[in-house]
């Protein structure tokens, strides 16, 4: 797959198709649930990290933005088949916002410097996951009025 800065004229469409495909993969990952209260664990974060690693910061974040927008528009793509703006404003909303931010961070860290090796990719994914969980826990604390310790 080409880096965003290596795209030739006409290839932005290819990038958008990749972003849409990873948005759909993230939606599919929402249906694979490990039920833990108060927020279920799914394969969404895996697909978010994969999109960012392969597509880079801009298209990786775009893929997650597509996923979130599909859910806001009413398609049942969020965990448990949920949809609508209420999900974004609920206990899992911070995590959804975190997917976009985390994808951007992972993509940026992977693309910074030379050719990424496994260690840099692992560190980038870890940093992205930490950002997703920081935003998710913050949102959960605000919405559910929990302390950070209770939210974790």
Residue ranges and their predicted role:
Residues 75-81, 139-152:
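Interfacial helix-loop-helix junctions of multi-pass membrane proteins
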Residues 60-64, 121, 151:
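Alpha-helical transmembrane segments and their helix-entry boundary regions
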Residues 27-31, 49-50, 54, 69, ...:
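Alpha-helical transmembrane segments of multipass membrane proteins
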Residues 43, 88-89, 147-152:
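Juxtamembrane helix-entry segments on the extracytoplasmic side of multipass membrane proteins
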